[in-house]
A protein has these predicted regions:
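RNA-binding accessory domains that recognize and position tRNA/RNA substrates
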Residues: 41-211
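Cysteine-centered metal-binding/redox modules
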Residues: 32, 40
């Protein structure tokens, strides 16, 4: 929902307070974020122009700022999630149901996903595919990629089409007042950094020809 449509359901969080706001989509493991227990937990996407959308977390539940982009593919979500060109970006998928055929390592475009988050309308809890090796939710958790399900992705994409690529905050909190304005300034100032270094190979790999 756009700002104003906030769920009344209470979020369940681990005792110890709210997550830290990290400076970008690549927090240091074990130190700069907290995982909340219980679920599904409320999640919010706050765009730099002030538009806000509500859903529920899938994968790790934490707070981050990222560049927000969209993709209109009807299939191939695992190829998209592992496409290194999305390094440091949160990707909104326009197709309404994601995850229904599971995940398979053979479909991966790189060794691991490098996008900062995955944002979908509905995540399928069941996968039906003889080729599947697991479900998308577990895949995101394994690789520490947060996401949101239940978003009005058409409305988000409409914002991006009208205003161009924008930054956004993914959070388990709804911010208001001065705190919100300070966050919006921080969101607008965010830039993706070190994308080439993160996506590039650290060592030479050889792919022997076959067939």
């Amino acid at each position: 929902r756009i700002s104003g449509g906030i769920s009344s359901r209470k979020s369940k969080r681990k005792s110890g307070g709210e997550a830290e706001l990290v400076s970008g989509p690549f927090p240091v493991r074990g130190g700069s974020f907290k995982i909340w227990e219980g679920g599904p937990m409320d999640a919010y996407l706050l765009l730099e122009n002030g538009a806000e959308f509500h859903g529920c977390f899938i994968g790790p539940e934490r707070e981050l700022i990222s560049e927000i982009v969209f993709n209109t593919s009807m299939s191939g979500y695992l190829e998209l999630v592992t496409d290194p060109s999305y390094t440091g970006q949160a990707v909104v998928l326009s197709y309404p149901l994601i995850g229904n055929y599971g995940v398979c390592r053979e479909d991966m475009e790189s060794e691991r996903p490098l996008l900062s988050a995955l944002l979908v309308r509905e995540l399928s809890e069941l996968e039906s595919n003889w080729h599947s090796e697991g479900n998308l939710r577990d895949f995101l958790i394994r690789y520490d990629i947060p996401g949101i399900s239940g978003l009005d992705t058409r409305a988000v994409i409409k914002q991006l089409r009208e205003h161009g690529t924008m930054n956004g905050l993914i959070s388990g909190r709804h911010y208001e007042g001065e705190e919100r304005e300070a966050l919006l300034r921080r969101i607008r100032d965010y830039r993706v950094r070190d994308a080439v270094r993160r996506a590039g190979r650290k060592e030479i790999s050889e792919f022997p020809p076959s067939g």
